[in-house]
Amino acid sequence: MRRTFIKKEGVVITTLARYLLGEKCGNRLKTIDELATECRSSVGLTQAALKTLESSGAIRIERRGRNGSYLVEMDNKALLSHVDINNVVCAMPLPYTRLYEGLASGLKAQFDGIPFYYAHMRGADIRVECLLNGVYDMAVVSRLAAESYLTQKGLCLALELGPHTYVGEHQLICRKGESANVKRVGLDNRSADQKIMTDVFFGGSDVERVDLSYHESLQRIVKGDVDAVIWNVVAENELTMLGVEATPLTDDPRFLQATEAVVLTRVDDYPMQQLLRAVVDKHALLAHQQRVVSGEQEPSY
């Protein structure tokens, strides 16, 4: 009987820990009756499980009689140990720009005390595929790419960071004076952003799409293999040296969406969504990113 009680209490502890990860210090907690209903448990067993979490130092609750119970302190790492999240792995773009490095460094800093790792991979499609298959816990993509994936089932937009947090600006790159004569446009089929923006920009135009690697784009224009490519401009002086020019992309909100970083989780991974809400201070993350971009701080990820 005692062994059965311990097993049931463990299940209730896991459910309570998942709930508490979504709360913030100072919040009024649900009543014990409400929690018991959510845990599908008795009031007594739910109280015992809550006491266990308190005794372990995972939480501290202040009980105010008729005014309810309030969460005063919480240890995210301790709570994580009760929900089978021993570490977090995030699929992230290759860190080839300071903006990406700042994002990676800033996000990791938010998970202080929680084992947090990156799997750097090129192409949003593969990052999302690995997320859906359960290989990773979350994935960083642009809002533009995210909106296309969210039409599928199984994904949740868990964190939005605002414009120009993913890339600075995509532009149309072509040889000088030839922006009106584009017949062949380069396209990396692994890049959801580039595919969508190319379709938006050229619309129904009779333009041939040429498959290439994103990082070969500029050289392929210079060689004459393609006439243009939509590309994230990082260094203007590089364009000048190569004899190519950039034209800003305007007149469609999707171009701005491509500059915003978002974090996706699986739709049923409530602990990960709650964890992001609980530990990420968006203002601090973005300030960290900007310090890395400006050179005030070295990235650490």
Model-derived features with residue positions:
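Extreme N-terminal segment that seeds HTH/winged-HTH DNA-binding domains in transcriptional regulators
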Residues: 1-31
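A short alpha-helical element within helix-turn-helix/winged-helix DNA-binding domains
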Residues: 27-39, 53
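N-terminal "mature head" segments of proteins
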Residues: 1, 22-25, 41, 55, ...
